[in-house]
Amino acid sequence: MVLKHSVTYNLSFFISFTFSSIFFSSLILFLVYKSVLSKLFFIKYLMLNLTKVGLRRFWSQSPRRNAPKKELSSLLESTITPKAFSKRTEEPNPIMQGTDTIPMPFYLHAKCLKNNTHITLCSPERKIIFRASGGTCGFRKGKRRGYDAAYTICSKVLEQIQVKRLGIENLHVIFHGFSQAREAVQNCLLGQEGAVIRDKIVKVMDRTPIKFGGPRGRRERRI
């Protein structure tokens, strides 16, 4: 009977001790958490106050804030007519003084093929004014190829330019292809026939297409 009472007493003491230890430990943890949280809130509050004070001091000492306010009309005038633009428009360009607008160029296309030559004169709008080839100049079949036929074709085109009085001021010469006809056209422009238009030539271009790979070409034409 005495043993039974001692066991119950020890059990109740153990239970009460565990509950009290849990209570006190939780209380200590709560107090620690509360103190840490209060310190964090204090640090956050201090940082916010410091940043507010710093921003106020910065804005109070900034030159842009203390600068006098400009009117809207003056701002619009400065944006619409800047000094650099007004200076550029006021000062005349010495290169362009005494010169009119540059007229649009005419185009002379010389397609120099192996068996024929095509020369076309185009307006600044790229419309055909006159064209000539071996057939229009009276050459037939194999006679359309060669130096003489190309020279005759070019001289006929230059003659038509002189007859029609087109008033060409600028001329672009564009070559297509490599053959004897190309040399003939060049010599005709540099010769007596091209004296009328030679001073008007401002640009010479070569637009010969160059083939890189691709499919097999057509068979060679035989006349």
From Swiss-Prot:
A family per Pfam: Ribosomal_S11
Designated name of the protein: Small ribosomal subunit protein uS11m
Compartment annotation: Mitochondrion
Range annotated as the organelle transit peptide: 1-38
Highest taxon in the source lineage: Eukaryota
Subunit record text: Component of the mitochondrial small ribosomal subunit (mt-SSU). Mature yeast 74S mitochondrial ribosomes consist of a small (37S) and a large (54S) subunit. The 37S small subunit contains a 15S ribosomal RNA (15S mt-rRNA) and at least 32 different proteins. The 54S large subunit contains a 21S rRNA (21S mt-rRNA) and at least 45 different proteins.
Gene: mrps18
GO CC entries: cytoplasm; mitochondrial small ribosomal subunit
Gene Ontology molecular function, alphabetical: structural constituent of ribosome
Function: Component of the mitochondrial ribosome (mitoribosome), a dedicated translation machinery responsible for the synthesis of mitochondrial genome-encoded proteins, including at least some of the essential transmembrane subunits of the mitochondrial respiratory chain. The mitoribosomes are attached to the mitochondrial inner membrane and translation products are cotranslationally integrated into the membrane.
Single biological process term from Gene Ontology: mitochondrial translation
Keyword set, alphabetical order: Mitochondrion, Ribonucleoprotein, Ribosomal protein, Transit peptide
InterPro entries: Ribosomal_uS11, Ribosomal_uS11_sf
Species of origin: Schizosaccharomyces pombe (strain 972 / ATCC 24843) (Fission yeast)
Family: Belongs to the universal ribosomal protein uS11 family.
Gene3D superfamilies: Ribosomal protein S11
